Design a protein with these regions (language model features):
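A conserved beta-strand element that flanks and buttresses the S-adenosyl-L-methionine
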Residues: 137
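Local beta-strand N-terminus motif with an aromatic residue
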Residues: 71, 132-133
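Short catalytic micro-motifs in class I SAM-dependent methyltransferases
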Residues: 140-144
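A short glycine-rich, Lys/Arg-flanked "PGG" loop and its adjoining helix->strand segment in the class I
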Residues: 152-164
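Class I (Rossmann-like) S-adenosyl-L-methionine-dependent methyltransferase catalytic domain
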Residues: 2-115, 120-127, 149, 169-224
Length: 225
């Protein structure tokens, strides 16, 4: 188990019990150095080209839905400093970034992205925080942080935040490749593709698939309303 501790328990417990203040404080502490870390190819955040691969796949998915995306908005769930939203915003009518960390949101707002808003909030409340969107994106293995029970709640929230024919793309840690990568934290939840697809169906998505080769540390879920 990771050495990360809190006065209210281990890191895994903090997420599983949805201790949102403790989670926010954890990410607040990383906000000022987050983009610098992502710019370092040796950083664990870039293990297996996670960020670059996510954005490339999302751009291809958007290109196949160009007209649909152009008349709808996009929600970045767990947006951090707004890097993903900055990559895709031009393809959508509007964008919203939601993150639990006030300091992350402060950095995101400083980008002054046109037609975008950044709000402090948690991803369990997407339908009440945002207008319904054509796409919900989430990069940062959000479900692997929160675990199965809370992850299911996030999927339900994402489904409720979408317009008909809208789509969700999020990444998750791949159980099948867990032993093949140097950075394999024990305090995260690793999912099989079959499991994550079943969770998406329970959340009400009509079409679900996973994207990525079986040896990838993180796979992507594509779920369509």
């Amino acid at each position: 188990m990771s050495g990360d501790q809190s006065g209210i328990g281990t890191l895994r417990e903090i997420y599983a019990r949805r201790h949102l203040k403790a989670i926010a404080a954890r990410w607040d502490a990383r906000a000022d150095t987050w983009e610098h870390a992502l710019a370092d190819p040796a950083c664990h955040l870039n293990d297996d080209d996670a960020f670059g691969r996510f954005t490339r796949v999302v751009r291809r998915l958007i290109a196949r839905r160009r007209r649909f995306c152009s008349i709808h908005g996009v929600i970045d769930a767990g947006c951090g400093t707004g890097l993903v939203l900055a990559e895709v915003l031009s393809a959508f009518a509007w964008g919203m970034g939601i993150d639990i960390s006030p300091r992350m949101i402060r950095v995101a707002r400083a980008k002054r992205l046109a037609h975008a808003r950044f709000l402090v909030g948690d991803c369990f409340n997407l339908p009440s925080l945002c207008p319904r969107a054509g796409a919900v994106l989430s990069r940062g293995v959000l479900l692997s942080h929160y675990g199965r029970e809370q992850g299911q709640a996030i999927l339900h929230a994402a489904r409720a935040a979408l317009v008909p024919r809208g789509f969700l793309v999020l990444d998750f840690l791949n159980e099948a490749a867990r032993a093949k990568h140097r950075h394999a934290p024990e305090n995260k939840t690793w999912f099989t593709g079959r499991e994550i697809k079943a969770m998406a169906r329970r959340a009400g998505f009509s079409t679900v698939t996973t994207l990525g080769k079986p040896n990838r540390r993180a796979l992507l879920l594509l779920a369509e309303a």
